[in-house]
Regions:
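A membrane-topology feature that recognizes alpha-helical transmembrane segments
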Residues: 1-236
Length: 236
């Protein structure tokens, strides 16, 4: 990696800042403006350390601008907090498009799983709605389990199902119309349960998406550091 130890020091500093952001978001449901500003202002040091040209710098600025516009739209519809908007925009100055897209996908998986789990915990179980409550909890378990399975596959680099497992499943499947009918029933149950989960909340919750952004950022940083270290050891 261009910049050597200085690049690794910057990555460590960014990872530390992200962990601080996660802790403050959990404790106070907000991320300090000074922290977001520090992350943004440190980005030029990262560009210098990694040898970015002017064209690449302009591309990073454009990526940050697009990120800011999109996240502001989410802020307007109350799907993202102001601190989350600033943090994700600041991170867009650090990551190239491909790693940043990976960060956004990881953020969506982590944030989605966390928000659904919190909604299940906050579910208002009313008398006479036991079936719908069960569907809601089942839908949330399916959602969280699916997100965790994808995250595990990404972390280990292994597919969700091996080729042998897929072949075994295909061999044991019943007739096509039965499979389609079961799939429709599962989807209908999931949809009904999810709608009930959204409608029956004890109170309005603010999901700490800053935690998901921070953890996703640390994840991508760790991958970049390991890849760079492996490449350096191969060259040496």
């Amino acid at each position: 990696m261009p910049g050597g130890l200085f690049s690794y020091a910057l990555m460590a500093a960014l990872a530390t800042a992200l962990l601080v952001a996660a802790v403050t978001d959990i404790k106070r449901r907000e991320i300090d403006n000074t922290l977001n500003l520090a992350i943004a202002l440190a980005a030029p040091l990262w560009w210098l350390a990694t040898g970015l040209g002017w064209w690449d710098v302009g591309f990073q600025l454009a990526l940050a601008l697009v990120t800011f516009v999109v996240t502001c739209a989410l802020f307007v519809v109350r799907q993202m907090g102001g601190g989350d908007v600033k943090l994700l925009t600041a991170l867009a100055l650090w990551f190239a498009p491909a790693p940043f897209l990976q960060l956004v996908v990881l953020m969506a998986l982590l944030g989605g799983a966390g928000s659904v789990a919190m909604a299940a915990w906050n579910l208002d179980r009313r008398p006479g709605e036991s079936v719908r409550s069960a569907l809601a909890l089942g839908a949330s378990a399916l959602w969280v389990g699916g997100a965790l399975a994808v995250l595990t596959a990404l972390a280990t680099g292994r597919p969700l199902l091996s080729t042998a497992a897929l072949q075994s499943i295909r061999a044991t499947l019943p007739a096509g119309w039965i499979v389609a009918l079961i799939a429709l029933l599962v989807l209908a149950g999931f949809a009904l349960g999810f709608v009930h989960l959204v409608r029956r909340q004890k109170s309005r919750m603010r999901v700490p998406y800053g935690v998901a952004i921070a953890l996703a950022g640390v994840w991508v940083l760790a991958q970049q550091a390991l890849t760079s270290a492996a490449a350096s050891s191969t060259v040496n």
